[in-house]
Amino acid sequence: MIVLSVGSASSSPIVVVFSVALLLFYFSETSLGAPCPINGLPIVRNISDLPQDNYGRPGLSHMTVAGSVLHGMKEVEIWLQTFAPGSETPIHRHSCEEVFVVLKGSGTLYLAETHGNFPGKPIEFPIFANSTIHIPINDAHQVKNTGHEDLQVLVIISRPPIKIFIYEDWFMPHTAARLKFPYYWDEQCIQESQKDEL
């Protein structure tokens, strides 16, 4: 039996979200044949021991806390990302749900609906510590640290591994967006898996 105390009803939303993420991680199935796996025992891991990199994107620190490729997760994937001031995600969309929990810092979410031929001018939403963001499926978006300190977010996606379509700008046609799969943090493991299959 697992007992997870999250305090009173007035507990921080971060504690609640992180607790739910830990439960999902605990009850998820692991795939022993997953490439580059960090799976099996121990179920509880020290987050400081997980791989962290910027994957060629200055100002980004990415860590897959629980993922499909690295840990064998089937339904959700959880990342911890830190953006230095001025750094940003590419303009992109994906066919999965995405939720951000802002742990610290501030920034801007740029979000455009994708019902036309191209995203168009995005709507700007300020984001800040203890705010949550829900990205609708296939809506083009970008997160940028527009603050003066690091922006740290916990990101939860559905249906991993993620397949991302990247735009050069907000007026690039959807049909011209470039598919990036596997995504940067899954590349090495998926390439090693393909080599093993030959």
UniProtKB/Swiss-Prot annotation:
Signal peptide as annotated in the record: 1-33
Disruption outcome: Embryo lethality, when homozygous. No visible phenotype was found for other null mutants. Reduced auxin-triggered phosphorylation status modulation of RAF-like kinases (e.g. RAF20 and RAF24).
Regions annotated as coiled coil: none
Outcome after substituting Q81D: Slight reduction of activation by auxin
Gene Ontology cellular component terms for the protein in this record: endoplasmic reticulum lumen; plasma membrane
Maturation and modification: Glycosylated.
Disulphide bridges: C36-C189
Subcellular location: Endoplasmic reticulum lumen; Cell membrane
Function recorded in the entry: Auxin receptor that controls cell elongation and cell division. Involved in embryonic morphogenesis. Acts on the cell cycle, endocycle, cell plate formation, and cell expansion and contributes to the control of auxin-related gene expression. Controls root meristem size and mediates auxin responsiveness. Involved in activation of ROP GTPases in response to auxin and regulation of clathrin-mediated endocytosis in roots. Acts as a positive factor in clathrin recruitment to the plasma membrane, thereby promoting endocytosis.
Subunit relationships: Homodimer. May interact with the GPI-anchored plasma membrane protein SKU5 and its family members. Interacts with TMK1 (via extracellular domain).
Name by which UniProt lists this protein: Auxin-binding protein 1
Recorded name of the encoding gene: ERABP1
